[in-house]
């Protein structure tokens, strides 16, 4: 009987175990740890760190995922030490700069190359009217186009800062030589035009400014700039007097 029982025990040990047991054997490490009497590795917690056991803390694994997330979420500082907090940034700044630079380049090219081409090719007009028309056309593309572009885009706000300590706004625009120009003003200096204009959103003192309201990250900054956060007061007596005078 003892021999028969020993033979059955050996046969049972030689047969493959259940599916979940064979999967554990394929993984190797937990089964080898059980055979050698070693403690099983603890599971990983969130962030790639080992859980603490009852006997002490195991070495922690550095979390590269957290470092990557922090590096991606870190953005360039948007505050200016002199102008304050950045509240607006135009998305057409590079386009405006590129168009005006191209216009200046072509104007300079025409200014220097037109006389040279006329001398080399011998182009001439007997009629005074044709000469005036020809030189007027060259002058238009040489001088009028850059001046027109400057007038249309000189009020385009590249960046707008707000300094809470001084309650001042600083608008950055391009000047005639394509350099950045800072205009400092208060909210009380902002005047909204009575008639909607294509290239003017508001006036800062006497200078026209063009901004896109949808590009303000915080709509409250736009409301504060335009004075929409203030209560509107209507003087009905003055309205009646104006109506009677008419």
Swiss-Prot record:
Transit peptide: 1-79
GO molecular function: mitochondrial proton-transporting ATP synthase complex binding
Claim: Transmembrane is one of the keywords in the record: yes
Membrane topology, as annotated: Multi-pass membrane protein
Parts of the chain on the Mitochondrial intermembrane side: 120-131
GO CC terms: mitochondrial inner membrane; mitochondrial membrane
Protein name as catalogued: Transmembrane protein 70, mitochondrial
Gene for this chain: TMEM70
């Amino acid at each position: 009987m003892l021999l028969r029982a020993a033979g059955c025990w050996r046969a049972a040990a030689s047969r493959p175990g259940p599916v979940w047991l064979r999967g554990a054997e394929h993984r190797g490490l937990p089964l080898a740890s059980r055979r050698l009497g070693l403690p099983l590795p603890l599971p990983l917690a969130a962030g790639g760190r080992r859980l603490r056991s009852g006997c002490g803390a195991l070495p922690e694994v550095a979390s590269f995922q957290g470092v990557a997330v922090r590096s991606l979420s870190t953005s360039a500082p948007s505050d200016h030490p002199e102008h304050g907090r950045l509240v607006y940034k135009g998305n057409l700044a590079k386009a405006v700069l590129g168009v005006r630079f191209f216009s200046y380049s072509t104007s300079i090219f025409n200014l220097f190359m037109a006389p040279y081409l006329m001398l080399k090719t011998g182009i001439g007009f007997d009629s005074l009217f044709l000469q005036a028309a020809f030189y007027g056309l060259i002058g238009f593309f040489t001088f009028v186009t850059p001046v027109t572009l400057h007038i249309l885009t000189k009020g385009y706000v590249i960046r707008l800062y707000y300094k809470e300590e001084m309650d001042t706004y600083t608008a950055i625009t391009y000047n005639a030589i394509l350099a950045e120009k800072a205009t400092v003003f208060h909210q009380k200096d902002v005047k909204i035009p009575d008639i909607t204009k294509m290239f003017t959103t508001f006036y800062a003192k006497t200078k026209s400014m063009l901004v896109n309201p949808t590009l303000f990250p915080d709509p409250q900054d736009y409301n504060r700039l335009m004075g929409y956060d203030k209560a509107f007061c209507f003087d009905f007596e003055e309205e009646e007097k104006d109506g009677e005078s008419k």
